[in-house]
């Protein structure tokens, strides 16, 4: 059995802790057979556990404690600690692993609820499960979500060499916003979502760059965002935003502008990689 989970990008600027998209980079796990102990085979680095302490197994055992140990191969081309949903992909894979091995027949809604409870917010896990563009809310232990088609475009990722861990990126956020500022932030997010639903990426991109919830406070941690935004605006991008907690910046681009934008970004920094993604429309898949 093979389980594949897409990378994700949360927030899209003003859709803080609510909006997310699935991307065409993947975590893949293969169940190879029975074993006396849980064993995870991977080449992802020493910091990733190879036994039952791995987040994949921890997640699966929370859902189905009776699971018997397996040998599992884990492969991922999702960069770690770069704001592309690497940990969320493992949680989603763990839920699907338990679902299949224990024959739980979980619905997509149940998977989103379980993943949100474990992750704390739905903006990454929901698109990882459902694919495409998802707007979600986690209020009073209830999870509400809507999936919709995201307009066609290229998604260019500017991925710095240095990681930025979510805990550090969240620590700079304020505990409160002034009421007037919160109203403005909410209205910007509303217009962004409506523009996406209408297929209007030029307007959606403008709203993505007007966020008031988090990007302002994270600028000191992601100094490259301002220059990327200036450069990509000049080259005809729809818009750019900090992916999740950063440090990756995503740029939405018309296909005909992508090569020129990528060339400009490559000149900007040698301490970053540039990748081009598509929107993954399927979410978690089992083969």
From Swiss-Prot:
| The protein, known as | Homoserine kinase
List, alphabetically, the SUPFAM superfamilies matched.
GHMP Kinase, C-terminal domain, Ribosomal protein S5 domain 2-like
The disulfides recorded in the entry are none
What function does the entry list?
Catalyzes the ATP-dependent phosphorylation of L-homoserine to L-homoserine phosphate.
Q: Which Pfam families match?
A: GHMP_kinases_C (PF08544), GHMP_kinases_N (PF00288)
Q: Which GO terms describe its molecular function?
A: ATP binding; homoserine kinase activity
HAMAP family for the chain: Homoser_kinase
Coiled-coil positions:
none
Q: In which pathway does it act?
A: Amino-acid biosynthesis; L-threonine biosynthesis; L-threonine from L-aspartate: step 4/5
Organism per entry: Enterococcus faecalis (strain ATCC 700802 / V583)
């Amino acid at each position: 059995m093979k389980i594949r989970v897409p990378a994700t990008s949360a927030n899209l600027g003003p859709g803080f802790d609510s909006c997310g998209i699935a991307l065409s980079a993947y975590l893949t796990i293969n169940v190879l057979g029975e074993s006396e102990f849980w064993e995870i085979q991977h080449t992802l680095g020493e910091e990733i556990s190879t036994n039952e302490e791995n987040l994949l197994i921890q997640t699966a055992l929370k859902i189905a404690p009776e699971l018997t140990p397996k040998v599992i191969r884990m492969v991922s081309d999702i960069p770690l600690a770069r704001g592309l949903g690497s940990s969320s992909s493992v949680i989603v894979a763990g839920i699907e692993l338990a679902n299949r091995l224990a024959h739980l027949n979980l619905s997509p809604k149940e998977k989103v609820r379980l993943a949100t409870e474990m992750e704390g917010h739905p903006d990454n896990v929901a698109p990882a499960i459902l694919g495409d563009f998802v707007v979600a809310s986690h209020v009073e232990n209830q999870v509400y979500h809507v999936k919709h088609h995201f307009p066609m475009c290229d998604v260019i990722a500017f991925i710095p060499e240095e990681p930025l861990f979510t805990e550090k990126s969240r620590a700079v956020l304020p505990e409160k916003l002034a009421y007037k500022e919160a109203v403005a932030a909410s209205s910007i997010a509303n217009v962004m979502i409506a523009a996406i639903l209408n297929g209007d990426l030029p307007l959606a991109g403008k709203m993505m760059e007007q966020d008031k919830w988090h990007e302002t406070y994270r600028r000191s941690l992601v100094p490259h965002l301002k220059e990327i935004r200036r450069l990509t605006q000049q080259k005809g991008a729809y818009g750019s935003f900090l992916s999740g907690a950063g440090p990756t910046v995503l740029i939405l681009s018309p296909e005909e502008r992508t090569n020129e934008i990528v060339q400009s970004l490559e000149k900007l920094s040698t301490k970053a990689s540039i990748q081009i993604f598509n929107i993954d429309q399927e979410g978690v898949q089992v083969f």
